[in-house]
Amino acid sequence: MNRRKFLGAAAAAIPAAQGLLFAGAQAAGGQTPASQPAEPVGGDGKLVPRFGDARDWWFQKRFGMFVHWGLYSIAGWHEQLEWRGGVPRKEYEQLFSQWNPKHYDPDAWLDMAQSAGMEYICFTTKHHEGFCHWDTRLTDFNVMKTPYGKDALRKLADACHRRNFPLCLYYSVVDWHSPLYPNQGRSHELEPQPGDHPDREKYVEFVKGQVRELCTNYGKIGGFWWDMYIDKIKDTSINAMIRQLQPAAVINNRGFDEGDFGTPERDYDRSWDMPLSFKRRVEANQSVGMESWGFRKEEDYYSHRYLTSSIAKYRARDANYLLNVGPDANGVIPEKAAGIVRQIGTWYKPVREAFDETLPVSAITANRNVLLTRKGNSLYVHLYQPPDGEEVRLRPLAIAPERAVLLNDGRPVEWRLDIAPMEWKDHKPYLRLHRLPVEEFAGTTLVVRLDFASLDLAGIDGMAAKASGTDPAQDAAAR
């Protein structure tokens, strides 16, 4: 017998003789212990504020698809090719005459999104390059003047409206094409360009005009997603116009005022990982590709495990999540990217009950490697961090479930109320999950549902589970 087995056998006899273990502890599906503790436990259990108006659709549809598509898709390097690649403006604009996405089919995009459980879409109407995907009257640098000659946004909007699939619009304030934009060589800006006549006031009027077009000519809009407003000079009139024209539109925090929600991007700022729940509305955004948001010919992709963990990390804290793909120049989402999205759907659909209409209650356990949500008399355990082994400790939670189920495939999960050998001095049994199939599911994120006869979470203030740090979602300038 090796040392671990010997100590385990010896330790099993000691607490049993002292009456410290619950003799009735069973695997999932067995009888609950008659001597389970009656002490109530509790957690934060707070949702971020709802709007109380037409924007509340956003809390019913929490998982969306982001799409980055533009002239940069022709080159297939990066969506910021012109800036990062140091491509002269005149040379870059030669891509304009090549734009002809013959296989663009927005219904194919939406089919893929819905197959993964996504319920809304956010589309780049104008990225930093300044190219406009709609029939704008304010610049000729738009899709109608290309060989394609069709309003790409119109086609997408029509497809979305046929399905009652909310459409959100991305719009970059930075513009590398407009001679009015004050390019000064700051981050994500070109150097001052010959022949430009920068005028901030006139450019803001240009932006307002384009926003009015977008919010007037394409039916109901679910959201407006600003990006890269470098000056950060506040102008509440612009978002006010959006709200007047599109009352159901949620607006992010990257525009001319603080907007409705924060936007953590990729894992650039790890402080977003620290709160157990958010006080301000949040929509995280991530791409399937590691290097680019737009189409990249030589892209390396994130693993399924990484992406499902990222989704769980935010959804379990009452946040929305946007997952991005970059169609190629023909309008086709690369097969590898599409396969990743479909695979995420096979994970998301069985476990989504653990996210939808649940409360974040992670404060009831000291285990920082899991997140907990609650719905009625059920708790959901999200193993968003790769587990070290087959056991998950939920200390100090000491309530016996009636059953425990692995949502990924529906199999029962073993559990016990007992004392871990290394914690024998505490003499306080708590709930532990056992023999989880971590090797079999090593490439994905496990979610366990615990069903209780009655679940009273009042009484614990979460002191043992408080995470350090502040909530970055309160910072309207967070990116």
Where are these regions (language model features)?
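Mature catalytic domains of secreted/periplasmic carbohydrate-active enzymes
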Residues: 8, 32-479
